[in-house]
Amino acid sequence: MISKDKRWQNKDYIKFVSEMPCSNCSVIDGTVVAHHLKHRYSPWGGGGMGLKASDILTMPLCYDCHDRAHNGDGEVLDFQAPFIFKTLDAATKHGVISITYKPYEYYRL
């Protein structure tokens, strides 16, 4: 049996992402949701059929752009990586995400 990595979930982070303008069209209309990374970047943990990426791999998308992403629109899907980086940058600048340094050896299994 192949084990699945536990995905990182954080409701506060998802709420923060949902309050941002849409990454694709910049709209702020109350329909923005946190879109999880999709199939084109699955090596990054983008899930797959019945799987969802970790909450850290999200970006804000309005209803229309989110619908386009889930219908395979390359104009949205091809820019997921930079949208996620932009979202992470905003979260770090606003103190939503903070990093505490620990040596690499600390994380070894």
Spans of model-derived segments:
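Short cysteine-rich loop/turn motifs with clustered Cys
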Residues: W8-H39, D64
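Generic signal for short, ordered secondary-structure residues
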Residues: M1-K4, R40-W44
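Intrinsic-disorder/low-complexity regions
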Residues: K4, Q9, I28, H66, ...
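Polybasic, low-complexity binding patches
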Residues: W44-M59, D67-L109
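Arg/Lys-rich, low-complexity, intrinsically disordered N-terminal tails that contact nucleic acids
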Residues: M1-Y13, L109
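Amphipathic repeat-derived elements
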Residues: M1-D5, I28, Q80-I84, L88
